[in-house]
């Protein structure tokens, strides 16, 4: 293992020490909670920073596993428009990742969903035995 790989592994272990990243793949519906920092200027001219959390729920259409720069692309329909957002898996701005539903797909990248709407864009749900999910949570 070279120096860069070792550095990346140390960095990943530091960032995942206090948060759990579940196993998910393309086709799964996830809920990503992101930390947003708002900057506002008060009347006396002082700058005020406020933190809040925003949830983003959608279908994972692509996943990129590249060490510390791993990311995944989530697509959702908001007010009739398709919205895609890429999240860095190990970013400190990503507060939590929760899997809502597991999907059954036969592709690693689901870019074809961009051209589909309605029933043709649905993904079958994969049912996981209860014992397996309880063991994963423990």
Curated annotation (Swiss-Prot):
Keywords: Ribonucleoprotein, Ribosomal protein. GO terms for cellular component: cytosolic large ribosomal subunit. One of its GO terms (molecular function) is structural constituent of ribosome. It comes from the Bacteria. InterPro entries: Ribosomal_bL19, Ribosomal_bL19_CS, Ribosomal_bL19_sf, Translation_prot_SH3-like_sf. One of its GO terms (biological process) is translation. Belongs to the bacterial ribosomal protein bL19 family. This protein is located at the 30S-50S ribosomal subunit interface and may play a role in the structure and function of the aminoacyl-tRNA binding site. This is Large ribosomal subunit protein bL19. It comes from Rickettsia conorii (strain ATCC VR-613 / Malish 7). The lineage of its organism: Bacteria, Pseudomonadati, Pseudomonadota, Alphaproteobacteria, Rickettsiales. The gene is rplS.
């Amino acid at each position: 293992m070279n120096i860069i790989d070792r550095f990346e592994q140390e960095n990943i272990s530091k960032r995942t020490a206090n948060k759990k990243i579940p196993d998910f793949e393309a086709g799964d519906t996830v809920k990503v909670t992101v930390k947003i920092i708002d900057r506002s200027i008060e009347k006396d001219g002082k700058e005020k920073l406020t933190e809040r959390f925003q949830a983003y729920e959608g279908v994972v259409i692509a996943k990129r596993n590249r060490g510390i720069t791993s990311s995944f692309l989530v697509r959702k329909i908001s007010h009739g428009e398709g919205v895609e957002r890429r999240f860095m898996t190990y970013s400190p701005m990503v507060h939590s990742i929760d899997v809502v539903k597991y999907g059954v797909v036969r592709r690693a990248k689901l870019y074809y969903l961009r051209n589909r709407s309605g029933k043709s864009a649905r993904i079958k749900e994969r049912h996981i035995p209860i014992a397996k999910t309880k063991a994963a949570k423990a």
